[in-house]
Amino acid sequence: MERIDTTGRLSRLRELMKERNVDVYVIPSEDSHASEYIAGCDARREFISGFSGSAGCAVVTLDKAALATDGRYFNQASKQLDQNWLLLKQGLQDVPTWQEWSAEQSAGGKVVGVDPELITGSIAKKLTEKVKRSGGSDLVPLDENLVDLVWAEARPARPKNPIKVLPEKFSGKDVKTKLKELRQELDRKNSRAFVVSMLDEIAWLFNLRGDDIPYNPVFFSYAIITSDSATLYVDASKLGEETRAYLADNDVCVKPYDIVFDSINTLRSSDTSCQTTSGVSSKRFMISTKASWALKRSLGGDSQVDEVRSPIGDSKAVKNKSEMAGMRACHIRDGAALIEYFAWLEDQLVAKKVKLDEVQAADKLEQLRSKQKDYVGLSFDTISSTGANAAVIHYKPERGACSIIDPTAIYLCDSGAQYLDGTTDTTRTLHFGQPTEAEKLAYTLVLKGNIALDTAIFPKGTTGFAIDCLARQHLWKEGLDYRHGTGHGVGSYLNVHEGPIGIGTRVQFAEVALAPGNVLSIEPGFYEDGSYGIRIENVAMVTEVKTKHSFGDKPYLGFEHVTMVPYCRNLIEPNLLTAEEKAWLNAHHADILQKTKGYFQDDPLTMTWLARETQPL
């Protein structure tokens, strides 16, 4: 991994801080829309620190610099940060959070500055409280982003890619129905308007897809929805005639992206109140808890704003019948591509003894996926990792500088694709030679956790927080664990990481119960730093299941797995599996064989590999 000398960049940033009387400057990862994955023009934290992981926050003082990130990226950050940076390993004992570290640095009446478009109102409030408790002066919102000024002309331009309509056969629900349901929520909340800032929520609401952020079919935009209007703020040059006509037919007004804050000021000053569709007078605005501090301030702050878990996000997370059918279908096609890839890779490495590096292998997988029906692109950077690289949880192989795949070591491939009918995310760990007993033990424990969660049945109202331990239990018995969540929501031809649901130990996963129609990943793992990494990831849908009893008159839920890729027989230790686990595995493999074999009628190499990997234990 490349390590960048950040000395000059930090020096220039500190000059700008001094000019503005700022002693501590916070640089979050997110863009103005709280996006997890961002466009190149918004990669400010990466530019200033050299750390390219998707999660983290940089904090710079006049003489120090710190980068905070979670356990997924400890290994990567330690390799990418230069001598100017302190790594704050979030979640470890006695390690301060970035907010705590920022507050500590503000002691003695110092000023903390931030771009208010890049943090939420709640984070701003908490940080302000911490700063003042530590003896700092205040948290100050700055009109200019100081990293942008350092970046100057080298900063990439904002993308202007075309926006297209997603046909209703894929979306399953028309725009007018979605707007009607959202307005009913405005009524229930007695809100004057909902200002929408999350890009995937806007794409879902209007059944549109774009290409402004790599791997995420979204576009830079805001939306304001009232009881009688819907306005989309977007660069109009991205809209073709068909998309313009479609929006007009759905009574959606289009205005320039850059004037959204002007429109908010006009809306605030136009009336002191308005009538909701139920006739109730309302003065308050509704925004998502993920909306920016700048947006909240422009709407009048706490006195005029209700911050809520987005009703659009809640609706989007519950897939309709068309979306669920699409997820099933695209995972079969995607599974076929992965099966062909793994058969090809084994043949190249073992039979033909070809030397392939990690990127060359990933390129082949992308080529195979691109042949599938309704393929659009990848859903994230493919993690193609051999040996010790597999222990880097979010490893990204670099073209021309990555490792040659070692057929005698573990190979981990975490990859996904965007299709018009759904989004995929699959991880498989393979070994093309003779794995060690330790590797087989770890793999089988991870597999047992995957099966335990896949087969779980739980009452309605259960959260992902409550069932996370099912995936970890077998590792825990051996004193092992992993430093990442067990599952995340998955969008329908949208972001591969989708809230508000998930499975993990974070408090946020205790806030929203799992519901039929939710689509999540199930991905336990184990990582031996410097040696190997193991992860097994499937995508599954929450469905209602029939039980003999119904305690508390509650329906009971379970999972339907949609990923159709075999597990690595070479890494399974059968003696560690129960009879029930073996039966589940055999049935699942038979299902995979039945649903994918039709793709390989003229491909004996792949068919032979598939038959071998799916034969009963």
From Swiss-Prot:
Keywords: Aminopeptidase, Hydrolase, Manganese, Metal-binding, Metalloprotease, Protease
Residues annotated for Mn(2+) 2 binding in this entry: D414, D425, E537
This enzyme's EC code(s): 3.4.11.9
Note describing how the cofactor binds: Binds 2 manganese ions per subunit.
Recorded catalytic activity of this chain's protein: Release of any N-terminal amino acid, including proline, that is linked to proline, even from a dipeptide or tripeptide
Recorded family membership: Belongs to the peptidase M24B family.
Record's function text: Catalyzes the removal of a penultimate prolyl residue from the N-termini of peptides.
Protein name: Probable Xaa-Pro aminopeptidase P
Protein's organism: Colletotrichum graminicola (strain M1.001 / M2 / FGSC 10212)
